[in-house]
Regions:
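Conserved helix-loop-beta element of the AMP-binding
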Residues: 132-134, 247
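Conserved SAM/SAH-binding loop
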Residues: 118, 140
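Rossmann-fold dehydrogenase core element
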Residues: 134-135, 156
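Conserved phosphate- and dinucleotide-binding cores of soluble alpha/beta proteins
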Residues: 2-39, 44-47, 59, 141-272
């Protein structure tokens, strides 16, 4: 655990840098993730200066550098920012993405949840150049931008709602309004926990509510989760395991838990 960012341990030789770094650390802690480019704009300094400041802050355990910016030190957040979690199990997530994208057919309407594994689905879907007339409904702003490259083969509908910067997601208020009026071919929903008894769970309540609405809006309900999520239980329940049509995970998942999930009535497929 680190301490709340402040001036302690910073050289007093450059008062402007002292104040700027303290404020940068505060932004990282308050927002969960801060981009180098955004910090440069806020403080009116170059990206080189921001990177130097973040490196100095990391050396004092005030922040942790990640690609493109910084997050709070490890262990301080129950929920990791998108930019941090995308580097966890990347090969497994990529395999799941290709597997899931292979299920989509021309003419399908697809609901695609926010998250790093669902982002892998979006990237794999872009590469399926033979698909036509596919509509993707998403609450992930980054996913919408990933799919923009495939327009007009793939039409993108953004759900609307209230922005959660930590995951670039849209939630309630107004996050489920559109979903309540849809009937999609399939929904691909991510999560932080898949347990045969508790069901599908997520680390935060606002997104769990949207995830449930996504599943209810689809004829086929698919959970995508790398092996580290299988057997885990988090704060917010999304649904029971028997409400899920299919779980796509990877071979690193605990085989005993996978067998229990299958026995509970949920089909399981291992990608990769």
């Amino acid at each position: 655990m680190g301490e709340r960012p402040g001036r302690g341990g910073v050289s007093e030789l450059n008062p402007l840098a002292v104040v700027r770094q303290a404020r940068m650390a505060g932004i990282v802690w308050d927002e969960g993730f801060a981009r180098v480019s955004d910090l440069a704009g806020r403080f009116g300094v170059s990206a080189v200066t921001v990177r130097a400041d973040l490196t100095a802050l990391e050396a004092r355990a005030r922040v942790r550098r990640v690609r493109g910016g910084a997050v709070p030190p490890s262990g301080l957040l129950g929920e990791q920012p998108f930019e941090s979690s995308q580097w966890e199990a990347p090969l497994q997530k990529s395999s799941i993405g290709v597997h899931a994208a292979g299920m989509i057919a021309t003419g399908d309407t697809v609901i695609l949840d926010v998250g790093t594994t669902t982002t892998a689905i979006a990237r794999a879907l872009v590469l399926r150049t033979g698909l036509r007339d596919v509509t993707v409904v998403t609450n992930g702003l980054n996913i919408a931008l990933e799919l923009e490259r495939a327009s007009p083969r793939i039409s993108v509908v953004v759900t609307g709602g209230t922005l959660r910067p930590l995951q670039h997601s849209l939630v309630n208020p107004l996050g489920t309004t559109l979903l309540e009026r849809l009937r999609a071919s399939v929904a691909f929903v991510g999560c932080n926990g898949v347990d045969p008894e508790v069901g599908i769970t997520n680390v935060n309540l606002p997104e769990a509510e949207v995830k449930r609405a996504m599943l209810l809006a689809a004829r086929r309900r698919v959970i995508v989760a790398d092996g580290s999520k299988v057997g885990e239980v988090e704060l917010a329940k999304v649904c029971d395991i028997e409400e899920v049509s299919l779980l796509i995970t990877d071979p690193t998942a605990d085989p005993e838990v996978v067998a229990e999930i299958a026995a509970a009535g949920c089909q399981v497929e291992l990608a990769g």
